[in-house]
């Protein structure tokens, strides 16, 4: 039906007869001439109808936005004065000789001239995806997956599919359950990741595996989360953590070079402890130049409990954040930042405004200066390298609250004051995470997952001091987003059972949930390691959007609903009966 795409026509096509198929993007009726912008997935081209082709001109008068049409015509060069430098096809136009209206369009529920609500865009997603910016994002996504496949094939990886209907295993979020009609009362689970299957593939001898795969997690959603999402899943045998990172870094550098024309360079490597200490985050945005500075040792003896308490508490921390030029902040802005850190558990926000350092106490403005002597203030200013015009904010509490609150404040202030260089790309690896973290109920939970190997520890050493264990794990972070994470896996049965025990999984439960894995570990398991990238998040970064729904063709809302198909929906009672399922309403509390 077509010979060319609208958006691919150039001066090299001048004089050629072409047939185009697409949609009316815009129509301008000048009486004796009618112009339309015609659009397909590759872009837009201007088509015009003149009186010499009367039948086509007459039919063109009926055109309206989003009519699906076919046009045959001749490509012509535009006059110099009519060239549109904002269009890729702006140097040419098509003189139409024939027009076919393939399908007409009703009045549109989306307005191309105004910003539509996200609810409307998701309800009429098939119309929203016609917009050039949305089409471009999905084309970029397709390019990314193509580049990934070629890279992985070239590096000896095998694309192997793993099951979608599997067994529920604890991986940190709730599973989506699928009832079995054949096995009454039993359920499959949709995979949160192919984690155990890819490890089993390594035990099967496949050495290098990858898969671009759908995963499912029934968890509370955020702006950058979806209940179903896509991973670039990777696993290797006989490779160390640095070797895995080297190959995966090469993949991401390849993507950025091919898609953005940007060489990311070598990725710096930072430990979890350093990232938390300097940036208050395990996924630091290195485009922001500000860092946290520990000042607890300077404040242990002050008669100000807000500072002295955490300064003398082994689990406490007092950190300072120097904001270049921050002395210009108003009291209202400072109060807003004080309220902001309370979201993260902080009780408030102390500060020192540095007006003129040379004037000593008279050169600063601070509500806490009365609790600190000149010597301590000068020591703080020295340590933070404060200059005239700077602001110093303080966080004082337990280590987690200080890291969370001051890390978030660092990002917010950096964005608000234009200190974060948003023209840059700042990738890094974060390594050496704690293996376990407090579950809030007196126990431990795996920071990554229970199949991650500890670093330089025997099973006996791990059992004796799990709180000291460092995971042989690594996350890739770009511009403050965790785009991928992985680890060296446990390949020894005793170590795996030790980890399960630390996590409170008794031997009976281990056999019930992971018997197949524990059995497989008995038969010459190779050392193996891997990683998974979030394809949606990678595409988000490479297309310049901050909304993950912009890079998924048919996404869910933050309530895990599809507004277009109205999923989820109530099931047919007959289907439920076949599955031996009965929906029971919860009793309402009076």
UniProtKB/Swiss-Prot annotation:
GO molecular function annotation: aspartate-tRNA ligase activity; ATP binding; nucleic acid binding
The keyword Iron is assigned to this record: no
Ligand binding (ATP): 217-219, 226, 482, 534-537
Secretion signal span: none
Annotated stretches, region: Aspartate: 195-198
Chief location bin: cytoplasm
Subcellular location: Cytoplasm
Quaternary state and interactors: Homodimer.
Protein name: Aspartate--tRNA ligase
Gene source species: Escherichia coli O139:H28 (strain E24377A / ETEC)
